[in-house]
Amino acid sequence: MFAVIETGGKQYLVKKGSIIKVERLQAEEKEEVEINKVICVSNNGLSCSSNAVVKAEVLEQCRDKKIIIFKKKRRKNYRRKNGHRQYITVLRINEISLQK
């Protein structure tokens, strides 16, 4: 069984036991979160149902790799280098359930 969930403006294809990195969620480590924005669920047949819930456990709150932003204008000696590290939450999917 797999599901497509939406969190942080992005969509993720998940199944039970998978580990994903998402935009930062307001949750503590080892806390269980419910994701209600489920696009579709499949168990050998596709079901676009709005009453599905995905439960996940927060494994870690950390920061992602550094992203480098480099601006340049040729022949003008204009160069700017900047970068940042995005905050992320690492989740383990524990359960995908359809509510009736």
Swiss-Prot record:
Q: Name one GO biological process term.
A: translation
Q: Which InterPro entries match?
A: bL21-like, bL21-like_sf, Ribosomal_bL21, Ribosomal_bL21_CS
Keyword check for RNA-binding, yes or no.
yes
Concerning Pfam families, the annotation shows: Ribosomal_L21p
Q: Which UniProt keywords apply?
A: Ribonucleoprotein, Ribosomal protein, RNA-binding, rRNA-binding
Annotated S-S bridges: none
Looking at the record's lineage, which domain of life comes first? Answer: Bacteria
Q: Which GO terms describe its cellular component?
A: cytoplasm; ribonucleoprotein complex; ribosome
Q: Name one GO molecular function term.
A: structural constituent of ribosome
Q: What does this protein do?
A: This protein binds to 23S rRNA in the presence of protein L20.
Protein family membership: Belongs to the bacterial ribosomal protein bL21 family.
PANTHER family given for it? Answer: 50S RIBOSOMAL PROTEIN L21, LARGE RIBOSOMAL SUBUNIT PROTEIN BL21M
Task: Give the record's subunit note.
Answer: Part of the 50S ribosomal subunit. Contacts protein L20.
- UniProt name for this protein: Large ribosomal subunit protein bL21
The organism encoding this protein is Wolbachia pipientis subsp. Culex pipiens (strain wPip)
